Amino acid sequence: MTGLDFSTAAMSIAREIAQSAGVAVDYVESDVYDAVELLGRNMFDLVYTGVGALVWLPDVRRWAEVVAQLLRPGGRLFLREGHPVLWALDETRTDAIAFGYPYFEHPEPLRFDASDTYVETGAVFGCVESREWNHGVGEIITAVLDAGLQLTMFVEHDSVPWEALPGRMTETDGEWRLTEHGDRVPLSYTLQAVKP
């Protein structure tokens, strides 16, 4: 098993978790766009991309090309990600479901300043600048198909594994759903594709 991330801190925590679980994992600290150069082509049976990964990437087409190059023939992409509709919602609004950010991909990132982070920690930071890109469902699926992968599944979900809209969600079995009108907004999706 191989794990790849650009964050030294994330890699350190991942190593601790793997060690405590008794799992052997090779960790590579790198920008995802350099993964093929570091890991080689046609090396993996499975590439897993987790929730929240794509928002850090400016170019989803390039990401899909990297995934396709990493996979062996017959290899599978498994992507569980926050839905672009969720990323476009204004999380500060508590009176209504309202859009506050673009749904479609833009060349320039959205910039956020905050004193918190997505990592569960009690630490308070002075200021954290976050740069994020949203990618619409059509852009993501087209990128995967254009990279030569065959789509085998796409399912939208009414839940996410964190409280994405604070004060407006209820947690059940490790997943958070809107307390009201949960049937109106997709919050995440699962996509699977195979390399022929």
Regions found by a protein language model. Give the residues of each.
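Conserved SAM/SAH-binding beta-strand->alpha-helix loop
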Residues: 7-9
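Conserved SAM-binding loop
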Residues: 14-15
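Short alpha-helix
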Residues: 130-154
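A short SAM/SAH-binding and catalytic strip from SAM-dependent methyltransferases
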Residues: 45-61
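A short acidic, Gly/Pro-enriched loop at the edge of an enzyme's catalytic core
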Residues: 33, 37-47
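Conserved class I S-adenosyl-L-methionine
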Residues: 76-118
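Conserved SAM-binding strand-loop segment of SAM-dependent methyltransferases
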Residues: 20-35
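A short glycine-rich, Lys/Arg-flanked "PGG" loop and its adjoining helix->strand segment in the class I
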Residues: 61-76
